[in-house]
Amino acid sequence: MDLAKIEKFIDKQKVSFICSIDDEAYPNVKAMLKPRKRIGLKEFYFSTNTSSMRTKQYLNNPNASIYFYHKGLFRYIGVMLKGTMEVLTDQESKDMIWKKGDTIYYKNGVTDPDYCVLKFKAMSGRYYCNLNTENFEIK
């Protein structure tokens, strides 16, 4: 499996899907903008509201997955990563992924208490392309 190819694929996507587990043990999926920061295939950083349902779910159960896909005319490519999601509220993490214009979502700026960072740590993945799938480990 060419992990560098998967990284390039992920970087081209504008949307990602994150999955959390609710208090009844059911998966919940949400479309998000692409990650704000990525370190290899191991770490992904997203911004979200501290008050969101998803944040509460990750605090209760950190098991998570993220998914990226592209649908072309004749083929579909998808990458699922499994791991854990951590909710970060420290200022250093918030500063790290803050973007100009984020005040549209977080009125009080980078120090807004309703702004937090989701840090996804991947353990394994599954790649799909042309009716073929391949599992891979992330070290």
Predicted regions and their residues:
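A short, Trp-centered hydrophobic/proline-enriched beta-strand micro-motif
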Residues: K8-E24, A64-F68
